Amino acid sequence: NSWGVLGTVTDGFEVINYRREDDGEREGYALLTEMERFTLRPGETTFTRPLDAGIHTTGNPGKVTAITLNLYGKSNQRGYLQNFDIKEDRVHRVYPPRQKKIMLAANAMDHLKGAAG
């Protein structure tokens, strides 16, 4: 959703960057290709770009706890993040808790109006 700087204090912080291959027009669908995979060493950093230019995953492939520091810029005005399921070529929107509650309440009201009418 925004730019970010990712760093690690300990070994074991893996970063995988992806490129989106589809045009984003088909709702719920996203075809991603892995572009690079690397593991940061203590004190190393990397960055991510906003939106589709910065699709990435991070994790710890090892068995020892990794300590990381990730700093992200101000979110764009889109209002949601996108969560990608790489194996299934799927994408769905993730909303902040407050916004999601408002959306759920509006959906419930619409449902009640439809049931009463």
Question: Where do the protein language model's features map onto the residues?
Answer:
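Asparagine-centered strand-capping/turn motif at beta-strand->loop junctions
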Residues: 57-61
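Short acidic-glycine-tyrosine-enriched beta hairpin
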Residues: 5, 19-55, 94-97
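Long hydrophobic alpha-helical segments typical of transmembrane helices together
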Residues: 84-117
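Residue-level signal for secondary-structure boundary sites
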Residues: 14, 46, 76-79
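Glycine- and acidic-residue-biased ligand/ion/polar-headgroup-sensing regions
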Residues: 1-21
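Short active-site-adjacent structural elements
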Residues: 56, 77-82
